[in-house]
Amino acid sequence: MEKDVEIGIFGGTGIYDSGLLEDAKEVDIDTPYGKPSDTITVGTFKGRKIAFLPRHGKKHTIPPHMINFKANIWAFKELGVTRIIAPSAVGSLKEELAPGHFVLPTQFLDFTKSRDGSFSEDGRVIHISVADPFCPELQSSITEVTDSLDMNIHKDCTYVCIEGPRFSTKAESKFYRTTGADIIGMTLVPECQLAREAQICYASISTVTDYDVWAEKPVTAKEVLETLSKNVEGTKKILTELIEKIPKDRSCSCAKALEEAEF
């Protein structure tokens, strides 16, 4: 099995293939938590070893509440991944975050209900810190890239994660707005906190597809896909520039996340 992969990319809604990888091959991994969402594509790009996994499966057959997040993170860890970039589709909770805009979340609010969000089991108790859930080093690299590309990306935003797969009611959407959160989606949690437990750096690049339902126009899956199809090239452009900007050595604290987390 490959053990020297540096960077893992989780494909979100609208991004189902790696596209940019050279010498790509499919890797099938079994984990203690079952199978990942699909086979993992491993290849190289600009001299960096990359693993790509669409979290919904290559044919988008896995709804958000049924994603095997633990298997996905474990599989990346098995390959040697130390950094994860996670594109995703989100709804906007604020008028200034318009469809087509990119968002760099720095905090989350967890409204999921039935997801297994920890590797803490079999007598191992982990109280991981997610005070700052995302790797500052990765976020800095993303900001550097989007600034150089003159792309409109909103920073310091809070992501509301809901269970799905249904969209919110109008009452729920208006409630989430009262929390001060900026965007809403279905996949960030527990993905980011499992990455922290695995001591893997993690950052999300979110694409706004709609105004949820607070704006009185109900969101539809068709609307989400139409917006994503227009913006997928923007996401790929960010990834293309980002991969070579990520430092080879880590200077963040993500690699030491368990040192003060276990009893």
Swiss-Prot record:
Residues annotated as site: Important for substrate specificity: S168, A221
One GO BP annotation of this record: L-methionine salvage from methylthioadenosine
Keyword field: Glycosyltransferase, Purine salvage, Transferase
EC number: 2.4.2.28
Catalytic activity, as annotated: S-methyl-5'-thioadenosine + phosphate = 5-(methylsulfanyl)-alpha-D-ribose 1-phosphate + adenine
InterPro entries: MTAP, Nucleoside_phosphorylase_d, Nucleoside_phosphorylase_sf, Purine_phosphorylase-2_CS
Pathway(s) annotated for this protein in UniProt: Amino-acid biosynthesis; L-methionine biosynthesis via salvage pathway; S-methyl-5-thio-alpha-D-ribose 1-phosphate from S-methyl-5'-thioadenosine (phosphorylase route): step 1/1
Protein origin, superkingdom: Archaea
Residues that hold substrate according to the record: M186, D210, Y211, D212
Binding site for phosphate: T13, R55, H56, S88, A89, T187
GO CC annotations on file: cytosol
GO molecular function terms attached to this record: S-methyl-5-thioadenosine phosphorylase activity
Protein family per UniProt: Belongs to the PNP/MTAP phosphorylase family. MTAP subfamily.
Function: Catalyzes the reversible phosphorylation of S-methyl-5'-thioadenosine (MTA) to adenine and 5-methylthioribose-1-phosphate. Involved in the breakdown of MTA, a major by-product of polyamine biosynthesis. Responsible for the first step in the methionine salvage pathway after MTA has been generated from S-adenosylmethionine. Has broad substrate specificity with 6-aminopurine nucleosides as preferred substrates.
Record text on subunit structure and interactions: Homohexamer. Dimer of a homotrimer.
Protein name, per record: S-methyl-5'-thioadenosine phosphorylase
Source organism: Nitrosopumilus maritimus (strain SCM1)
Phylogenetic lineage: Archaea, Nitrososphaerota, Nitrososphaeria, Nitrosopumilales, Nitrosopumilaceae
